[in-house]
A protein has these predicted regions:
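Mid-domain alpha/beta scaffold segments of enzyme catalytic cores
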Residues: 1-130, 134-136, 140-141, 148-149, ...
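Histidine/acidic-residue-rich catalytic or RNA/ligand-binding cores of hydrolases
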Residues: 14-18, 114, 144-151, 174-180, ...
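Short, acidic/turn-prone active-site loops that include or flank metal/cofactor-
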Residues: 33-37, 188-193, 217-218
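Short helix-capping segments at alpha-helix termini
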Residues: 62-64, 156-160, 206-207, 236-242
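Electropositive phosphate-/nucleotide-binding environments in soluble metabolic enzymes
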Residues: 82, 86, 144, 171, ...
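Catalytic pocket-lining loop regions of alpha/beta-barrel enzymes
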Residues: 121-201, 210-212
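Short acidic/histidine-rich active-site segments
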Residues: 206-224, 244
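Mid-to-C-terminal alpha-helical segments outside catalytic/metal-binding sites
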Residues: 228-288
Length: 288
């Protein structure tokens, strides 16, 4: 079964992860822009970060047979930082036209501040202007209120819900999002957010329409193989193969195809591992 990983921060992962992901059936990965663990102090650091995601990281993934895509944004946490917020917002339009950029994200809330509301609305407008879908981060604290405010702002700016993926959902937020028209994302984590047994129960209770799962693997304690591990449990619990495939392939691919930039033929085309990126390779020298 082919898997499309719709949320993994591969910039912070190692080559072993790519190898194991490919062996587990992951053929495409979507990397949202996010916070790096400490504050960035200038807009220039975002330039380098965006360039790395659309350039080197895309190349690095392909050397392991995985197609790499991304969404770009000013992330919710750094929306509160006046050293960078307006500058990054001004920077984004030229990056949102780049190859492999399938949406605007992660946007949304961290502490649910007025600044975060302002930049969420502004970036939904950017997504509209560039005809791209939006990937929305829901806060780790006060998640229900964050989801409620997200949906309210979407309504205020009249952004179409079918072009929004609201991520990091839990049992508490599903009832809020299920009838909104948004795609619902669930991040399967080792100790927080969502685990495999709870995820399977959510799917059994609410169905698989507009549902996607991801690992949200990053620099913290996380596991880029959480999707295939969840697939294994789905099978053990008797879920039909076509329903499993819907969650891990058809739903995420259909959502990001709304960008008009996701070519399914590309996902089926093998990648040559003998390429160079600006004169560099993943081998760190000639073959032995």
């Amino acid at each position: 079964m082919r898997i499309f990983e719709p949320h993994a921060h591969m910039f912070s992962r190692v080559t072993d992860d790519y190898e194991q992901m490919a062996l587990a059936g992951i053929v495409g990965v979507l990397e949202p822009a996010f916070w790096l663990g400490q504050p960035r102090t200038s807009v220039g650091s975002f330039v380098d970060y965006f360039d790395a995601i659309i350039g080197w990281e895309r190349f690095r993934a392909e050397q392991f047979g995985i197609r790499h895509y991304c969404t770009l944004s000013l992330n919710p946490k750094e929306a509160n930082d006046d050293r960078v917020n307006d500058g990054v917002l001004a920077l984004l339009p030229r990056y949102l036209e780049k190859d492999g950029v399938l949406g605007v994200g992660e946007i949304g809330f961290d502490d649910i501040t007025p600044r975060e509301e302002r930049y969420l609305a502004a970036q939904l407008e950017l997504a509209r202007a560039h005809d791209l879908p939006a990937l929305v981060h829901t806060p780790h604290r006060d998640k229900v209120r964050g989801v409620e405010r997200t949906l309210a702002i979407m309504r205020e700016v009249k952004f179409p819900p079918e072009r929004v993926l609201i991520d990091h959902n839990t049992e508490q937020t599903v009832p809020l999002v299920i009838d909104s028209g948004c795609t619902m994302g669930f991040s399967i984590y080792p100790d927080t957010k969502m685990d495999e047994p709870r995820m399977v129960e959510i799917l059994r209770q609410w169905g698989t329409d507009r549902m996607v799962i991801n690992s949200a693997a990053d620099w913290g304690k996380s596991d880029p193989l959480k999707i295939p591990k969840t697939v294994n449990l789905m099978r053990q619990k008797g879920m039909a193969e076509h329903e499993i495939e819907k969650v891990v392939w058809h739903n995420p691919v259909s959502f990001f195809a709304k960008s008009g930039r996701l070519d399914l033929r590309e996902l089926d085309t093998p990648v040559s591992p003998n390429q160079l990126f600006e004169g560099n390779s993943i081998l760190r020298g000639p073959r032995a």
